[in-house]
C-alpha cells in the first residue's frame, strides 16, 4: 500500500499540473502563432494521457491476487501500460517530425516572443518538478523477492527477516520459522506474487476493503496450511518491473526537452531576429516572393529599405524539434522493445538457454530435459517450466533441489518441474517423453509442430538425442498398414482357430 500510495500521489500531482499547463499552452500558441508552443502543448496532452494510463495500470498492478479468470492477477498491467505509453510517444515523435518538415518548407515568424519565453520557462519548471518526482524510475535495479514451485512444492526468498511465521496446522505444534528458512513440516512460502488466501483457494487482496479478513493479520496458504503473518510484511518493491513508471518518466523528460526548445527558440528569436516595424518599408528575403523583380526595383529607387533577418533564426525551431525527436526515439525504443518482448514471452536476454539446458542435463540423476520454456512475467520475475526425466522416483526430491539451484544460478526463481521416470529395464539410447500428447492436439500445443524423428537406417547413424512428446506420438502411429488382400487371410485363420469365439479384426 505504501508503494502504491507514493506513486499514486506523484501521478495525481503531476496530472493536475500537466493538464492545467496544457490548456495554457494551447491558448498562448494560438495568440502568438507559435508552432513550437503548439507542438509542446500536444506533447503535454500526451503526458496527460500517459499519466492516466499509468494511474490505471498502477492500480491494477497492485491486484496481484489470483482469480478464476486471471491466475497471475493484474501483475502485467504495468507492462501493458508501458507499451501503450511507448507507442503513443513514438507516434507523437513522428507527428512532431512532420510539423518540423513543414516548417522547413514554409518558415513562420514568431509573434510576441517574450510571452512565449515566459510560458516556456514556467513549463520547464513544471517538468523539472516532474523529473524530481519520477527520477528514481529512470533506470532498473534487481529485485530480490522470488518464489518457486517444484512438482507441487513451493518456497520463497527475499522476505524481510524480522517477522516470524506461525504454523496453524491441525495436529502439529507451533513452529516459528523465519522467512527464507524451512521447518520440519513446512515448505517455504511461494512469494512470486504476494497473496492472501480464502477457504476456496482463491487469493484475496489484503488492501481490498471488501476483504473481510483484512485487519492486523492476514492468512497465507503454505502447502495447504493456513499461516498468519502481519500486514506489514510486504515484498521489496520490484523496481525492475517499473516499466510503466519509466514510461511516465520518459514522457516528462520529453516534455522538458520541448520546454527547453521553446525557451531557446524564444531567446534566440528575441535577440537575433530583426523584424519589420510598422510604417517602414521592409522586405523579408527569408520567404519566397513572387514579386522579386518588383522588390529589386523598389530597392533601387528607395534609399531606406529595411530587410528582416537573419533567415537562419526561422530554421532554428524546426532544427531543434528534429533533435528532440531523435532524443525521444532513442530513449523510447528500449522501453518499447522490452515491454513488447515481455508480452511476447520471449526468453529474457540475460538467460543463456543453451547453457541452462546443458547444466540441467549434467545434473546427476537426470536422463533428459525437454519441453523447457523460460519467459518473463514482469520485471525480474522470470518463470521456467520443464519436463525432467529421472532414473529413480525415490531420489527425485534431491534431484529437484539440485535443479532448483541451477535455475537459481541463472536468475530464474519461479520454476515448475514435471517429473518423468524411466521405465524399469529401459536401456534405449533414445529417451522419449513419457507423457506423449495425442496427435490431434499437436497444433494446439505451445510449440506447434516439430520435425519428424529419423527412422530406419538414418536412425542408426544418428546419435542419441532427446525426442519430444509430439515426435513420439507421431512415430507410434506410423505403423505399416495392411492392404485389403492381406487382411482377408488373417481373418480366415482366426475363424478356423477359434470357432467358438467372435472373430477379431485388427482393423
UniProtKB/Swiss-Prot annotation:
Glycosylation, residue list: 299
One GO term describing the cellular component: Golgi membrane
Residues covered by region (6 X 2 AA approximate repeats of H-G): 146-158
Post-translational modification (record): N-glycosylated at Asn-299. N-glycosylation promotes endocytosis and degradation through the proteasomal or lysosomal pathways.
GO biological process: cadmium ion transmembrane transport; calcium ion import; defense response to bacterium; detoxification of cadmium ion; detoxification of zinc ion; in utero embryonic development; intracellular calcium ion homeostasis; intracellular zinc ion homeostasis
Membrane topology of the entry: Multi-pass membrane protein
Domain of life: Eukaryota
Cytoplasmic topology ranges: 1-10, 57-78, 135-248, 330-507
GO function terms (MF aspect): calcium channel inhibitor activity; metal ion binding; zinc ion transmembrane transporter activity; zinc:proton antiporter activity
Extracellular side: 32-35, 100-113, 270-308
Keyword field: Antiport, Cell membrane, Cytoplasm, Cytoplasmic vesicle, Endoplasmic reticulum, Glycoprotein, Golgi apparatus, Ion transport, Membrane, Metal-binding, Nucleus, Phosphoprotein, Repeat, Transmembrane, Transmembrane helix, Transport, Zinc, Zinc transport
Annotated segments matching region Disordered: 142-217
UniProt binding sites for Zn(2+): 43, 47, 251, 255
Residue stretches in coiled coil: none
Residues spanning the membrane: 11-31, 36-56, 79-99, 114-134, 249-269, 309-329
Short name of any one Pfam family annotated for the protein: Cation_efflux
Record family assignment: Belongs to the cation diffusion facilitator (CDF) transporter (TC 2.A.4) family. SLC30A subfamily.
Subunit structure: Homodimer. Interacts with TMEM163. Interacts and forms a complex with TMC6 and TMC8; the interaction regulates zinc transport into the ER. (Microbial infection) Interacts with human papillomavirus 16/HPV16 protein E5; the interaction alleviates SLC30A1-mediated transcription factors inhibition.
Function: Zinc ion:proton antiporter that could function at the plasma membrane mediating zinc efflux from cells against its electrochemical gradient protecting them from intracellular zinc accumulation and toxicity. Alternatively, could prevent the transport to the plasma membrane of CACNB2, the L-type calcium channels regulatory subunit, through a yet to be defined mechanism. By modulating the expression of these channels at the plasma membrane, could prevent calcium and zinc influx into cells. By the same mechanism, could also prevent L-type calcium channels-mediated heavy metal influx into cells.
Full protein name: Proton-coupled zinc antiporter SLC30A1
Organism: Homo sapiens
Designated gene of the protein: SLC30A1
Amino acid at each position: 500500500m505504501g508503494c502504491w500510495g507514493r506513486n499514486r500521489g506523484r501521478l495525481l500531482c503531476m496530472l493536475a499540473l500537466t493538464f492545467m499547463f496544457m490548456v495554457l499552452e494551447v491558448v498562448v500558441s494560438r495568440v502568438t502563432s507559435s508552432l513550437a508552443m503548439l507542438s509542446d502543448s500536444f506533447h503535454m496532452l500526451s503526458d496527460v494521457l500517459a499519466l492516466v494510463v499509468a494511474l490505471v495500470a498502477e492500480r491494477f498492478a497492485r491486484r496481484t491476487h489470483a482469480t478464476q479468470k486471471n491466475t497471475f492477477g493484474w501483475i502485467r498491467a504495468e507492462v501493458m501500460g508501458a507499451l501503450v505509453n511507448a507507442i503513443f510517444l513514438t507516434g507523437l515523435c513522428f507527428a512532431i517530425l512532420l510539423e518540423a518538415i513543414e516548417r522547413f518548407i514554409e518558415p513562420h515568424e514568431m509573434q510576441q516572443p517574450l510571452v512565449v519565453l515566459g510560458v516556456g520557462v514556467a513549463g520547464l519548471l513544471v517538468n523539472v518538478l516532474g523529473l524530481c518526482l519520477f527520477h528514481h524510475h529512470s533506470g532498473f535495479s534487481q529485485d530480490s523477492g522470488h518464489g518457486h514451485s517444484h512438482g507441487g512444492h513451493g518456497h520463497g526468498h527475499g522476505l524481510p527477516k524480522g517477522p516470524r511465521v506461525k504454523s496453524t496446522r491441525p495436529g502439529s505444534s507451533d513452529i516459528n520459522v523465519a522467512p527464507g528458512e524451512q521447518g520440519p513440516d513446512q515448505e517455504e512460502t511461494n512469494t512470486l506474487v504476494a497473496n492472501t488466501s480464502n477457504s476456496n483457494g482463491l487469493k484475496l487482496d489484503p488492501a481490498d476493503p471488501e476483504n473481510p479478513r483484512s485487519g492486523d493479520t492476514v492468512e497465507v496458504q503454505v502447502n495447504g496450511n493456513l499461516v498468519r503473518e502481519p500486514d506489514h510484511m510486504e515484498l521489496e518493491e520490484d523496481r525492475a518491473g517499473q516499466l510503466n513508471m519509466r514510461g511516465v518518466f520518459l514522457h516528462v523528460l520529453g516534455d522538458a526537452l520541448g520546454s527547453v526548445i521553446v525557451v531557446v527558440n524564444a531567446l534566440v528569436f528575441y535577440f537575433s531576429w530583426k523584424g519589420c516595424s510598422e510604417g517602414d518599408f521592409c522586405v523579408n528575403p527569408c520567404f519566397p516572393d513572387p514579386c522579386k523583380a518588383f522588390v529589386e526595383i523598389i530597392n533601387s529607387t528607395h534609399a531606406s529599405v529595411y530587410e528582416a533577418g537573419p533567415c537562419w533564426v526561422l530554421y532554428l525551431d524546426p532544427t531543434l524539434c528534429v533533435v528532440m525527436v531523435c532524443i525521444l526515439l532513442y530513449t523510447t525504443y528500449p522501453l518499447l522493445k522490452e515491454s513488447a518482448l515481455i508480452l511476447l514471452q520471449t526468453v529474457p536476454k540475460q538467460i543463456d538457454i543453451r547453457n541452462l539446458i546443458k547444466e540441467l542435463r549434467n545434473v546427476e540423476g537426470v536422463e533428459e530435459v525437454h519441453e523447457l520454456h523460460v519467459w518473463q512475467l514482469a520485471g525480474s520475475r522470470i518463470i521456467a517450466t520443464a519436463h525432467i526425466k529421472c532414473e529413480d522416483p525415490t531420489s527425485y526430491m534431491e534431484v529437484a533441489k539440485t535443479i532448483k539451484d541451477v535455475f537459481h544460478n541463472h536468475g530464474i526463481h519461479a520454476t515448475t518441474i514435471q517429473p518423468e521416470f524411466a521405465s524399469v529395464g529401459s536401456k534405449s539410447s533414445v529417451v522419449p517423453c513419457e507423457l506423449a500428447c495425442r496427435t490431434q492436439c499437436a497444433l494446439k500445443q505451445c510449440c506447434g509442430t516439430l520435425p519428424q524423428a529419423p527412422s530406419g537406417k538414418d536412425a542408426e547413424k544418428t546419435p542419441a538425442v532427446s525426442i519430444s512428446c509430439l515426435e513420439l506420438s507421431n512415430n507410434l502411429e506410423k505403423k505399416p498398414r495392411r492392404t485389403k488382400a492381406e487382411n482377408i487371410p488373417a481373418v480366415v485363420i482366426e475363424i478356423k482357430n477359434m470357432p467358438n469365439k467372435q472373430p477379431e479384426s485388427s482393423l
